[in-house]
Design a protein with these regions (language model features):
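Alpha-helix-loop-beta-strand connector modules within alpha/beta enzyme cores
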Residues: 45-65, 119-130
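N-terminal start-of-chain detector that recognizes signal peptides
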Residues: 21, 33-34, 63-64, 99-100, ...
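Active-site beta-loop-alpha junctions enriched in small/polar residues
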Residues: 9-13, 38, 65-67, 95-99, ...
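Internal, glycine-rich beta/alpha segment that forms the wall or movable "lid"
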Residues: 2-4, 74-172
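Aromatic/His-enriched, Gly/Pro-containing loop or helix-boundary segments
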Residues: 70-71
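N-terminal beta1-alpha1-beta2 module of alpha/beta enzyme domains
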Residues: 1-60, 158-165
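Glycine-rich loops and low-complexity Gly/Arg-rich segments
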Residues: 31-36, 57-61, 85-89, 116-120
Length: 172
């Protein structure tokens, strides 16, 4: 016997439509509802926050937040808030990002594949430590962070899901 689960991937739609479609997916028996992240679309975490308020059971996930375009500490704060709001139903899909998805419009963004992969690795390390609310210094190749105990008092609480929010990353 397997524990196979089924999720639905939503098209790029508004936050209100994400909430409506996730509610419909839950009502029709789906196990998960996933929202993409593209440069020109609404932020998936906003849509999933709306969905967290209209659903009770279905898992809510991103596919796939390109970490080279985000600061890991901001993603940590946002995902911790969404994990609490959804009562532990968040799956955080993150990746290095697909350069063909509009990055050419932003000449300051990192397009080198190796550098983007390094940024993803560093982001995973930082996210994991922030989810544990550790005091730490991080001096990576791409990200630098000095987190004191005083800083931690303002950072969101640990995630509902332990030991951390599930992090999914694609492989191509």
């Amino acid at each position: 016997m397997t524990n196979l689960k089924f999720g639905v991937a939503l098209p790029y739609v508004s936050a209100r439509e994400v909430a409506e479609l996730c509610t419909l997916a839950e009502e029709t028996g789906w196990d998960g509802c996933f929202v993409g992240d593209a440069i020109w679309c609404e932020d998936p975490l906003i849509g999933l926050a709306a969905a967290a308020m209209t659903t009770q059971r279905i898992r809510l996930g991103t596919m796939i937040i390109p970490m080279p375009l985000r600061k890991p500490w901001k993603v940590a704060s946002e995902s911790l808030a969404l994990d609490r709001l959804s009562e532990g139903r968040l799956i955080l899909g993150i990746g290095a990002g697909a350069v063909w998805m509009g990055w050419q419009c932003f000449p300051d963004e990192v397009t080198d594949t190796k550098a983007r992969a390094e940024m993803l690795d560093e982001s995973i390390d930082i996210l994991t430590r922030l989810y544990r609310r550790e005091q730490f210094d991080y001096d990576g190749k791409h990200f630098h962070l000095k987190l004191t105990q005083m800083d931690l008092q303002y950072f969101p609480p640990k995630p509902v899901q332990q030991p951390r929010i599930p992090l999914w990353t694609p492989g191509l």
